[in-house]
Amino acid sequence: YFFAVNIAEEEACDIDTFNTIAYAAILHDIGIHEAEEKYGSSAGKFQEIEGPSVAKELLKDIELQEEIKNRIFYLIGNHHTYDKIDGIDFQILVEADFLVNIYEDEISRESIKSIKNKIFKTKKGIELLDTLYLNNSNL
């Protein structure tokens, strides 16, 4: 969440986009437990299948425009499918997710460089990636 809203602030996103990013960042992995129960796996493709319905249940009583809710569900249902990135909200969510996953998954410096070249586009996302992982001589 922190990385997503930090990048969104730097990108000067409008309030609807910012809210979409914030909710999606909090909820994007919400399908993990359902995926593990149904498929015995928390793989991204299963999270994408299960996540939107779990998020719909959680957000049903939250006052948000339907368009924003639907975009949140779309982002949750596609956040591991990088060729579907179709907007700044999706771009920021993916970059923020990578910033966390690189640390959690102990991704190699060479792989980080590849991710940077293939995925990262926002100025703040690139700055965070460089500062946290590529400018650090301990990696």
Tell what function each PLM region has.
Residues 13-23, 62-76, 89:
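Acidic/histidine metal-binding catalytic segments
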Residues 18-40, 51, 73-80, 97:
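His-Asp-centered metal-binding catalytic motifs of divalent-metal-dependent phosphohydrolases/nucleases
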Residues 1-4, 45-61:
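An active-site-proximal "capping" alpha-helix that borders the catalytic cofactor pocket
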Residues 42-46, 87:
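Residues at secondary-structure transition points
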Residues 2-14, 27, 64, 79-139:
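Divalent metal-dependent phosphate-bond-processing catalytic cores, especially two-metal-ion Mg2+/Mn2+ enzymes
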